[in-house]
Swiss-Prot record:
Predominant localisation class: other
Enzyme kind, highest EC tier: hydrolase
Lineage, uppermost ranks: Bacteria, Bacillati, Actinomycetota, Actinomycetes, Mycobacteriales
Protein source organism: Mycobacterium tuberculosis (strain ATCC 25618 / H37Rv)
Name this polypeptide is given: Serine protease Hip1
PANTHER family, sorted: 2-SUCCINYL-6-HYDROXY-2,4-CYCLOHEXADIENE-1-CARBOXYLATE SYNTHASE, TRIPEPTIDYL AMINOPEPTIDASE
Note: Hip1 is an attractive target for developing immunomodulatory therapeutics against Mtb.
Lipidation (N-palmitoyl cysteine): 31
InterPro entries to which the protein is assigned, alphabetical: AB_hydrolase_1, AB_hydrolase_fold, Serine_prot/Carboxylest_S33
Length: 520
């Protein structure tokens, strides 16, 4: 959320929300901070055990389930310099109610999303048998949410300003303007966080943090559930500590071996497929704002959203009316649409939003965009957007070849026309990572984890954010089991599908992997 978004940044951001469960969790949890029960928890020191205390919420309207415990764990910022700077990881734990096997540690991905908020959501739907046998544990990765230091680059005003602008001018002057905004964003990150911390926020270090959490919980081996980009954390842990894994479920896979540009284009195709599926469903109903012919849905969609940009100057916004004084910008109309495409449970909200836009009103799409961008009713953002950029930029090599970026823009316009404004100009801005001040700590590679126990990768056939093939590829690399879900949402474990939950519960408790070809 934060800097001027190039097409590459927009596509990369599509991993933000993890399925219908996340949509529910966001409504319930929002941008709260969950901390230990004392008014001010002292920051822990290296080597200290976690001091667990009853959790409390910064939002009085959000009730934390009874028995939830919170604490912090100190880890070195740089594991090669354990006497240097320290980070404090925020944790939440829901104790097992029966004969405990160990801890089930979860992460929702993003990257940059709060594992504490995710645990609050998963706790509501966790099967009773799993709750009996495991402590449910969530953690905010280094730099994220309630962990300290947290990555902050933009102010709330910065985010509102950037969202208000169309971000579609790919003329030579427009590209220069976008890249100047990007450089200013990078400068804010360096000024506020320092290069040393930014150099150590990547998943390679988060995997080491995860092992420190395992040890602090008293577990000899890790039992882990990762959603979306949380699968990247899981596969990194499996590579670094294959002998310390008891069980691992990876749902909505990110393939560490994927070429970054090709992965982004596959994500773009996934969202175009989701848009097409939505349009076909909408067309069955009288009054569909995209009309009765799904083949014309993209054309009709652009007739609704393109007028939000001044046709004579694509850097000028012509926002739709909203009760909020901000209005609905073109950028937020696209983001609100993407938010609704994560799950069919949100399609009716997209229909409502597009129906409003017919009358130049934008309240529903703005609300969806605010949910996606993590802006609360008081105009405050959490730090997930800034954290996501910082993590992505050290997790993969930057694309600095402008010819490749221009070719990606051309291909993306063909693959995902609903997200594409105007015509191909033959120019495109470099993404944020091209200007990042520290080098990446990881490169695309196939996962190698000799001695790893059987794992379970869950992949959804029409997942808009993490394509099905990524799950197939990751399962092959891990030599694990592939569990297929036939659906259109992003991630599925512990979200109400009894078939999926039976398979993963049997695996978590007894180690029984799904049979070859298992499908729900």
């Amino acid at each position: 959320m934060g800097m001027r978004l190039s097409r590459r940044d927009k596509i990369a951001r599509m991993l933000l929300i993890w399925a219908a469960l996340a949509a529910v969790a966001l409504v319930l949890v929002g941008c709260i901070r969950v901390v230990g029960g004392r008014a001010r928890m002292a920051e822990p020191k290296l080597g200290q055990p976690v001091e667990w205390t009853p959790c409390r919420s910064s939002n009085p309207q959000v009730k934390i389930p009874g028995g939830a415990l919170c604490g912090k764990l100190a880890v070195p910022v740089d594991y090669d310099r354990p006497d240097g700077d320290v980070a404090a990881l925020a944790l939440i734990r829901f104790p097992a109610t029966g004969d405990k096997i160990g801890s089930l540690v979860i992460n929702p991905g993003g990257p940059g999303e709060s594992g504490i908020e995710a645990a609050l959501g998963v706790f509501q739907t966790l099967p009773k048998r799993v709750h009996e046998r495991f402590d449910l544990v969530g953690f905010d990765p280094r730099g994220v949410a309630s962990s300290r230091p947290a990555i902050w680059c933009n102010s709330d005003a910065d985010n509102d300003r950037l969202r208000a602008e169309p971000q579609v001018d790919y003329s030579r002057e427009g590209v220069a303007h976008i890249e100047n905004e990007t450089k200013q964003f990078v400068g804010r990150c360096v000024d506020k966080m320092g290069k040393n911390f930014l150099a150590h926020v990547g998943t390679v270090n988060v995997a080491k943090d995860l092992d420190a959490i395992r040890a602090a919980l008293g577990d000899d081996k890790l039992t882990y559930l990762g959603y979306s980009y949380g699968t990247r954390i899981g596969s990194a842990y499996a590579e670094e500590f294959p002998q310390r894994v008891r069980a691992m479920i990876l749902d909505g896979a990110v393939d560490p071996n994927a070429d970054p540009i090709e992965a982004e284009l596959r994500q773009a195709k996934g969202f175009q497929d989701a848009f097409n599926n939505y349009a076909a469903d909408c067309a069955k109903n009288a009054g569909c704002p995209l009309g009765a012919d799904p083949a014309k849905a993209v054309e009709v969609y652009h007739s609704l959203v393109d007028p939000l940009v001044d046709p004579d100057n694509p850097r000028i916004s012509r926002p739709a009316r909203t009760k909020d004084p901000r209005g609905l910008s073109y950028s937020d109309a696209i983001v609100g649409t993407i938010m609704a495409l994560y799950s069919p449970n949100l399609w009716q909200h997209l229909t409502d939003g597009l129906s409003e836009l017919v009358d130049n009103r934008g309240d529903t799409l703005l609300a969806l965009a605010d949910m996606y961008m993590r802006r609360d009713s008081h105009g405050r953002y959490n730090n997930s957007g800034d954290a996501r950029v910082a993590i992505n930029c050290v997790d993969q090599p930057p694309v600095t070849d402008r010819d490749k970026v221009i070719d990606e823009d051309r291909r993306a316009r063909e693959i995902a026309p609903f997200m594409s404004y105007g015509k191909f100009t033959g120019d495109a801005p470099l993404g944020t990572c091209a200007f990042w001040p520290v080098p990446p700590t990881s490169q695309p590679h196939a996962v190698s984890a000799p001695g790893l126990v059987p794992t379970v990768v869950v992949s959804t056939t029409h997942d808009p954010a993490t394509p099905y093939k990524a799950g197939v590829d990751l399962a092959n690399q891990l030599r694990g089991s592939l569990l297929t879900f036939d659906g259109t949402q992003h991630t599925v474990v512990f979200q109400g599908d009894s078939c999926i939950d039976e398979y993963v519960t049997a695996y978590l408790i007894g180690g029984t992997t799904p049979p070859s070809g298992a499908k729900c």
